[in-house]
Amino acid sequence: MDLGIRGRRAAVAAASAGLGLACARVLATEGVRVALCGRRPDRVEAAVDALRAAGGDAVGLVADVSGAERGGAFVDRATEALGGVDILVTNAGGPPAGTFASTDVAAYPPALELNLLSTVAMCKAAVPAMIERGWGRVVAITSMTVRQPAPTLILSNTARAGTTAFLKTLATE
C-alpha cells in the first residue's frame, strides 16, 4: 500500500506495544521516520529493534505521556530527534473501569489528564509547525466507546469522547 507519506516524520505515543506499536509499524513500512515512546526502556528498545529489523527508520524515547506536561514534552523530544513532526499519533492507556455509582469525582481529573489533556498538549506541541509547513496529520487512538459507551467504563467513555470532540474541533480550525 502506498499512502503517499514516504519521507515524512511521525511521533507515535505509547508505541512500545499494542495499538501504538501497530501504528508505528505501518508508518515505518510506508517509509516514515518514526519516533516512538513508551515508559519501559526495554520495551522501547525492543520496539525500535523490531521496526529497524523490518527496514524501518525508528528512534525510541523513554517517555510517559499520561499528562499534559509529559505529552507535550514527548512531542518536543520527537521534534528534536526527527527534525520535525509531520504526523502525530496520540495514544495512551485507559483509566480504571468503574460505573457512575462506584467512581468518585476525584477520579475524573486523572482520567482527563491521561487521555484528553495529554492529546491537547501533544497537539499544542506539534500542530503549529504543521500549519506553518502547510501539511500535517493527527491520528488519535481512542475507542469505539465514543460512539456507544460501555457500561463499566465511565471514565474512559468521558475522556475519550472529549478527546474526539477536541480533535473534530481542531480539524475545523
Could you tell me what each predicted segment is?
Residues 32-46:
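Conserved glycine-rich Rossmann-like NAD(P)H-binding loop of the short-chain dehydrogenase/reductase
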Residues 99-100, 107-112:
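Substrate-binding pocket helix/loop in short-chain dehydrogenase/reductase
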Residues 128, 172-173:
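Alpha-helical segment proximal to the catalytic Tyr-Lys
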Residues 139-163, 167-172:
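Catalytic loop of short-chain dehydrogenase/reductase
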